[in-house]
């Protein structure tokens, strides 16, 4: 969701995730939005590291109370004179990462690195992409940046992602006027246009669990909005069941690369 930039709330509630740095950032943000004496309630699964996080938050702030049941826990703290560690606060905003040429933050896919699968796909992006292009599940913008650099014929590229923080990061990382940005969940919402080409590293996790259906929904969405003859470039973990969907929804497809971990495919609508 879009960030709440300021506030003085008496109560805040935070659902913890599986990512430690994201939790640090969210707790720092939640604390900053509390009024003096306000309470922040955090809840999460022990499988996602909530027990360990509870100890770290207790050391940083002191806790007012905890509850534990059904492999989950809740703990809460009061905003008083102890502020979040500086590192936690830094994680709550976009910051230079990697080689320093791009900005990101926890909560974005592969937030502090170039994903290996995306890097492999980028090497197979052609130099003749043109017209209206889209990046489905754009993350912080790596594939779009590579596509724009390789293909001067691109007239416009739409960057779409279900994570609002990813869109904020992509907007900061790509200043090319051909790029536009939209916060949109392609598994639930229709893409905003039809396209001559789409690049994609589809999501396949919900929490810690693998959910191939997420990627399948994104592939189906791409097939619906590609123009006849349009090209779909995709990378995925090679064990995911995507080929039957490519075969059913596209005129043809081929494997461009297979390194025993990732598979790069090109499909023609």
Name each region found by the language model:
Residues 197-224:
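Mobile active-site "lid"/loop adjacent to the S-adenosyl-L-methionine
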Residues 22-97:
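N-terminal auxiliary segments of SAM/dcSAM-dependent transferases
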Residues 24-36, 215-228:
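A short glycine-rich, Lys/Arg-flanked "PGG" loop and its adjoining helix->strand segment in the class I
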Residues 9-15, 195-203, 233:
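Short SAM/SAH-binding signature in class I
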Residues 45, 161-165, 214, 237-238:
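Short beta->alpha hinge that forms the Motif I/post-I loop of the SAM-binding pocket
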Residues 116-200, 206:
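Conserved SAM/SAH cofactor-binding pocket of Class I
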Residues 68-132:
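SAM-dependent Rossmann-like transferase core, predominantly class I methyltransferases
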Residues 38, 155, 230:
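Glycine-centered, small-residue-biased loops immediately flanking beta-strands
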